[in-house]
Amino acid sequence: MKLDATDVRYITPDEFRVLTAVEMGSKNHEVVPTHLIAQISSLRHTGISKLLSGLLKRRLVARVRNNVYDGFRLTYGGYDYLAVRALSKRKSVYGIGNQIGIGKESDIYIVSTEEGECRVLKIHRLGRISFRNIKEKRDYMGKRKSASWMYMSRLAAEKEYAFMQILHQHGFPVPTPVDQNRHTLLMSYEDAYPLRQISVLPLDQIRRLYSALMALIVRLARAGLIHGDFNEFNLLVREIRNEEEDDSVSAEGDTPATDVRSEGVVEHGKGFTRIVKADSASEEESEEEDEEEDDTSPLNQVVELGEGVQVEPILIDFPQMVSTDHPNADMLFDRDVNCVRRFFRKRFRFESEEFPTFAEVMETVRRDESERLDVLCLLYTSPSPRDLS
């Protein structure tokens, strides 16, 4: 499911009211009957059909027919619109740009504020192509026995936002959390490269980066946390620039904010703005551009950093984080360490005999419990061990 904010400005307040009613009805109904939608939205039953028909055409809701009664269910598209509208009303998001990342459990978009500041919107989409036994592998539901994919996506976003806030407050290298609504998470834009895209690094920086990543794993563990998915897909690498370089870059106008508005035109609607391609472009040209973007997409580009550059890591993706008190904490810690070691061995032909172990780190933690963060109260620790490999 790809976010398309084109029709957000065309949806009327009554249609959003109906969409919200379907969402509220979904808490207790897998299929929400029409009369319940009318009751929750406080609209006339005769007008509900027309409003639902419009939402149905935009694929924001889906009609479900069964033997007992007919009704509607909310789609991920409708859930996206509700979240985007809420962020827009809070002035957190003004325009939506291109998709800059896609994963098994989420989609990443670049967005902008009314002042032109770039931000990153992460939309959780559990159950799309991610592992289907996620209800057992991740502690999203707590004591609940069952839940919909949308509800778990919302729990994942809330959990990640809480982790990001605590980590950012304690000085960990993570993006700045900005806002969160439903299954979406808004954070600061970091001018950095995904570690998986970097193919060449100076030897001194390879050692420096390896040491920084191992130190970050240890620092998290000393704070009572284990990332659980510490690999090249969840790590960004940022170039360290001095003030003179930053001034020269800003003087040239090479800022992230220009990336969102570099192509296309800005369309203004009812409380929302979307960046689209120019109207003069034909459909054939658009298709050709899409094909070219697939080949030269930033997601597939290889980055080479030459001599003289200095780098530092930024950690992302936190829904799967667990406490060091988790029954599988030692296995998860060792897996994080081995992911880094394996990547550096394959990508940079670099291998070090120096790496942390869970037992050694926990021994130092027992001597000084004051380093553990308050974030532990946010964690749900499984009562019994689970196979999380």
Question: For each predicted feature, which ranges?
Answer:
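Single conserved hydrophobic/aromatic residue that forms the stacking wall/gate
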Residues: 380-389
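ATP-dependent phospho-/nucleotidyl transfer catalytic cores
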Residues: 8, 51, 77, 133, ...
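Conserved ATP-binding subdomain of kinase catalytic cores across diverse folds
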Residues: 80-193
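Short alpha-helical segments that sit at the start of domains
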Residues: 1-17
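Catalytic-loop of the protein kinase fold
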Residues: 225-228, 232
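A short, conserved structural fragment
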Residues: 58-66
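Short amphipathic alpha-helical interaction segments
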Residues: 42-54
